[in-house]
């Protein structure tokens, strides 16, 4: 009988043995209990994900968003947290927010963020191997599941009771209620009473988010002299609204396109002799080929890494707009939506703590995600107040589109990371 293992099997055995030894040395007995609790909870986590995904909750479906909240409130109550629903004024078209908190006095005060609303509706939950499909799976109902079951694992291990943890799940992240000072008042209040904030937007793949770009709307309005097209470019007529808009958009492109982390997208344009503005934000134009266009509107967005970058970009855009072609007049207006989550040193320090957790779990290093790869998010409203880290949710793809999915292998992985990070922060 040959007592030697084949070399490949032997190497694998030694690797597993060493990994087990390292894992055992890195985690305390209580931390091992938390990790074991996460593993044991996977069937429950999958069930909660399915139930939340099967509730259609696009932002404008206020009833659906509230149904998600009604499903989650008793779950947080079951792990000893006090809960309430934060209503928004009726005219804001926002379902409101779910708030939960522990009543302890130990460790850092931790604020956890997520959102219950989605962009699309209609695609029900289905599982195909290690992937779960459905509207809002990745963005971000799986993130809510990670957040909740991280806390439940702490509760199961007796490590949640004396902590100072707040949870805020918004109902309008995908289309923020206006005015923002009202829709995000509870978030700002919670942040001011916290030492740090963690957000559970989709993440995984050994990356986390220390910075997110802000988001702003802009609208360009052009008016011009109108008349028979045979007179265009003459001093008496000028250049028309469409040539003026083309000049402005081209100068935006030439002047701003190469600035790092800055993007601007003219998404809607309509121009002609007359414009009609619809209640739903639509713009329609009429005109004739032999008439110089009198009006034009362009709408778009602006994304930026800091308030300073936003202000500088707006100043350049305003200057470009002011240099009108003959016979035209233009103005540009801006509207704030999401502030930027700038890459502060304190955010990187939180990332280092998550990286230590990940390596202690044997899951590898955590690197910061390039801010250019991520859009705006709720955490940006409070990231200037306290240290902030995002991207703690599960990995997925196809967000805001049919075929959206979450990688179920990362559901447990991310829950373990989040649970141990919260545990260490609250000791």
Q: Can you annotate each of these PLM segments?
A:
Residues 25-135, 155-160:
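Acidic/His- and Gly-rich active-site-bordering loop/insert found
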Residues 106-169, 190, 402, 407-409, ...:
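Active-site metal-coordination/substrate-binding segment of hydrolases
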Residues 1-7, 162:
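Positively charged n-region of N-terminal signal peptides that target proteins for export
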Residues 25-29, 33, 40, 57, ...:
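Metal-dependent amide/peptide-bond hydrolase catalytic core
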Residues 140-217, 271-278, 426-427:
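Acidic/histidine-rich catalytic neighborhood of metal-dependent amide-processing enzymes
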Residues 10-21:
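Bacterial N-terminal signal peptides
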Residues 46-50, 69, 73, 148-151, ...:
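Extracytoplasmic/secreted envelope proteins and their assembly/folding machinery
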Residues 116-128, 211-222, 356:
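Acidic-glycine-rich active-site phosphate/pyrophosphate-binding loop
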């Amino acid at each position: 009988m040959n007592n030697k293992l084949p070399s490949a099997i032997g190497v694998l055995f030694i690797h597993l043995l060493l990994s087990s030894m390292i894992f055992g040395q890195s985690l305390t007995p209580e931390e091992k209990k938390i990790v074991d609790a996460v593993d044991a909870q996977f069937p429950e986590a999958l069930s909660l994900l399915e139930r939340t995904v099967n509730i259609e909750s696009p932002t404008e479906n206020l009833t659906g968003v509230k149904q998600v909240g009604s499903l989650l409130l008793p779950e947080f109550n079951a792990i000893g947290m006090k809960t309430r629903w934060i209503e928004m004024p009726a005219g804001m078209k926002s379902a409101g927010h779910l708030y939960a908190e522990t009543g302890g006095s130990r460790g850092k005060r931790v604020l956890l963020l997520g959102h219950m609303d989605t962009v699309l509706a209609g695609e029900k939950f289905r599982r195909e191997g290690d992937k779960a499909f459905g509207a809002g799976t990745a963005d971000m109902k799986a993130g809510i599941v990670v957040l909740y079951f991280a806390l439940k694992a702490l509760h199961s291990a007796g490590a949640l009771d004396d902590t100072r943890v707040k949870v805020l799940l918004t109902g309008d992240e995908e289309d923020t209620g206006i005015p923002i000072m009202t829709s995000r008042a509870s978030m700002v209040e919670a942040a001011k009473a916290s030492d740090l904030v963690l957000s559970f937007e989709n993440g995984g793949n050994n990356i986390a988010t220390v910075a997110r770009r802000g988001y702003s709307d802009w609208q360009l309005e052009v008016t011009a002299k109108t008349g028979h097209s045979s007179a265009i470019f003459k001093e008496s007529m000028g250049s028309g609204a469409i040539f003026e808009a083309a000049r402005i958009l081209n100068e935006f492109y030439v002047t701003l396109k190469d600035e790092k982390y800055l993007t601007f997208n003219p998404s809607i344009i309509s121009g002609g002799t007359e414009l009609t503005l619809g209640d739903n934000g639509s713009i329609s134009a009429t005109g004739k080929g032999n008439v110089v266009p009198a009006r034009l509107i362009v709408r778009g967005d602006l994304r930026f890494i800091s308030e300073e970058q936003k202000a500088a970009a707006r100043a350049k855009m305003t200057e470009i707009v002011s240099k009108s072609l003959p016979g035209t007049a233009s103005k540009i207006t801006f509207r704030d939506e999401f502030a930027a989550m700038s890459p502060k040193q304190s955010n990187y320090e939180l990332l280092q703590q998550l990286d230590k957790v990940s390596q202690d779990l044997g899951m590898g290093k955590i690197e910061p995600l390039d801010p250019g790869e991520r859009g705006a998010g709720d955490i940006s409203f409070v990231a200037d107040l306290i240290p902030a880290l995002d991207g703690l949710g599960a990995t997925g793809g196809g967000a805001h589109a049919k075929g959206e999915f979450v990688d179920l292998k990362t559901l447990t992985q991310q829950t373990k990371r989040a649970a141990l990070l919260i545990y260490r922060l609250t000791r």
